[in-house]
Amino acid sequence: MREIIHLQTGQCGNQVGCKFWETISGEHGIDQTGKYVGTSDNQLERVNVYYNEASSKKYVPRAVLIDLEPGTMDAVRQGPFGDLFRPDNFVFGQSGAGNNWAKGHYTEGAELIDSVMDVVRKEAESSDCLQGFQITHSLGGGTGAGMGTLLLSKIREDFPDRMICTFSVVPSPKVSDTVVEPYNATLSIHQLVENADETFCIDNEALYDICFRTLKMSNPGYGDLNHLVSLVMSGVTTCLRFPGQLNADLRKLAVNMIPFPRLHFFVVGSAPLIAIGTQKFKTYSVSELTQQMFDSKNMMTACDPRKGRYLTVAAMFRGKISMKDVDEQMSMVQSKNSTLFVEWIPSNVKTAVCDIAPTGLEMSATFVGNTTSIQELFKRISDQFTVMFRRKAFLHWYTGEGMDEMEFSEAESNMNDLLSEYQQYQDATVEDAEEFLVN
């Protein structure tokens, strides 16, 4: 089977990751102890993608849980799904990274990385035909950002031909919990550009907006935000886990989504959006799902796709859906909003359809877009970075761990290059496209 090894680093990564395991365990009929209690053969047909089957008919996630302090790990162990994970796969330090990227990447993280890689190799060896890795982390802190990107480069070294996709929680302007977020995020993006194959950008501000505006919650907590992220993670991987009429895997997704290797940062969305624990009263049609899916209010990334242009889009539908409906809706969206799609990629939309709907719904859709408007997100971080870096504010925390200012300048210029690449392709027309080909 095409296995995927899941890695979660830092507090945010571990909380998002645990929610993801809750969601897909529910879909596969696996209870909190790893026993199968489902009702349909489809649930077990490809359960091996994410689970190892242990001797006692127990299904164990192919997950490695990593943090530089024991607190989050203890919380996971005591949580409802604490017994699901393999005890050896918890790898943690004692000191913490204190929101310092350099600690996660160069000092504390570097001390722990070998034990993490041992566990990763063990998981890879127990796989039949490893497809790749997925990492959940945040870019604003120390462990998820610093150690998460160190892990990324180590995996790239050891498994050069496997796909690596990251679900990265990007710092957002209105919801900031750390002053040095712009530094940590810029240094991380510098790494992601070089080492990740696909990065799904998720942003707390957009998630809060969805909770307030769409789900009408009065005070959403991180649990609610993580639930939304887990919907997208489960949607993106549906085709790998269940039989479908039109399948996608990580590599197919990458081939269809990434026209230029550096531009692999995606906005994501999900439809219909339903809060935890609420009952659904409405059945949706394919056209309603498509409309919702392309609606900027449903995006889990704080940038407005209407301000940029889509290079490519992938849409994953789930449920008993006719392919004809899907194709019609997709071509309608493209012709109605033709200005939002670049015209030098003739068929920008890749669709996948999986027959098994998520728990409690008749049909759902997951949206992944490669849009040039994501530069808004990078621009915000870059501006905040520049303001602080010009004054060399807080730099001593990083140089004290052995970093050089040079590395900051490199990360800054890499970020600026990325911005201008997105801008270049946003402005490009078919006539320019001929010039690209000549170059």
UniProtKB/Swiss-Prot annotation:
InterPro entries in alphabetical order: Beta-tubulin_BS, Beta_tubulin, Tub_FtsZ_C, Tubulin, Tubulin/FtsZ-like_C, Tubulin/FtsZ_2-layer-sand-dom, Tubulin/FtsZ_GTPase_sf, Tubulin_C
Subunit-level organization: Dimer of alpha and beta chains. A typical microtubule is a hollow water-filled tube with an outer diameter of 25 nm and an inner diameter of 15 nM. Alpha-beta heterodimers associate head-to-tail to form protofilaments running lengthwise along the microtubule wall with the beta-tubulin subunit facing the microtubule plus end conferring a structural polarity. Microtubules usually have 13 protofilaments but different protofilament numbers can be found in some organisms and specialized cells.
Location in the cell: Cytoplasm, Cytoskeleton
SUPFAM superfamilies: Tubulin C-terminal domain-like, Tubulin nucleotide-binding domain-like
Keyword Metal-binding listed: yes
Cellular component aspect of the GO annotation: cytoplasm; microtubule
Primary location class: cytoplasm
Function: Tubulin is the major constituent of microtubules, a cylinder consisting of laterally associated linear protofilaments composed of alpha- and beta-tubulin heterodimers. Microtubules grow by the addition of GTP-tubulin dimers to the microtubule end, where a stabilizing cap forms. Below the cap, tubulin dimers are in GDP-bound state, owing to GTPase activity of alpha-tubulin.
Gene3D superfamilies in the cross-refs: Helix hairpin bin, Tubulin/FtsZ, C-terminal domain, Tubulin/FtsZ, GTPase domain
Binding annotation for Mg(2+): E69
GO biological process: microtubule-based process
Keywords: Cytoplasm, Cytoskeleton, GTP-binding, Magnesium, Metal-binding, Microtubule, Nucleotide-binding
Cofactor(s), names only, from the UniProt record: Mg(2+)
Protein name as it appears in the record: Tubulin beta chain
Encoding gene per record: TUB2
Binding-site list for GTP: Q11, E69, S138, G142, T143, G144, N204, N226
